[in-house]
Amino acid sequence: ICIDLDEILLPGWRKILEQNWKEDTTRVYYTYNWKLDNNNRPLVTFYTDKIHKRNGYKWTHPVHEVLTPMIIEHKIIIKDIILNHYPDLNKSRSNYLPLLEMSVKESPNDDRNMHYLGREYMYHQKYNEAIDILIKHLNLKTATWKDERAASMRFIGRCYNYLERYDEAILWYKKAIKEAPYLRDPYVELALLYHKLNKNNKVIYYTNKALSIKNKDMTYINEIFSWD
């Protein structure tokens, strides 16, 4: 079991794990409350997977570390095991960018960290660099997860929005919608841009499209603002 210093497993996890672990189990997905409000209510929740068999795995990447299997996996989901995240909000993100750059340099065909690097450039307001890297992510043959591809497209749209290149922003938000029409996020971001541009009919249209999506998948991709 691997958790960070700013994470806490809720009581009872061991008994639940022992009751559900089978002889051929190698890895467990469980509930991760990545962000909580001041009353300890979850805001961002998804499954994570750092409970694993002792042998047959190794850790890779200098940041956003990945548990990489060297065996054939048999995974199970135990949603009643809950891990809460209590980050230090005063901690700087400045170390993430050079580590992600190092990670991508070491593994240039790793789609996951290419996506993370593009996102990190966006967070650092390096919008042109972010766009270039996110397009590289989309062009990787291994970048097949539609949710993450749509997020890269959405971040490209967001960067163009920040650069006040609104036509290109709209184009990429629409690409994100086409890639993953079952996610709220691209509809919401496009509606917000149309609100900024005072195109109210389109605000109403895309907001209603977002609200028609009721299912919130258990992945890290979901934005808080699409569901609050």
Q: Over which residues does each language-model region extend?
A:
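Catalytic-site signature of metal-activated, phosphate-bearing donor transferases
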Residues: L9-D132
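Short beta-strand-to-loop acidic/aromatic patch adjacent to the donor-nucleotide binding site
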Residues: I1-L10
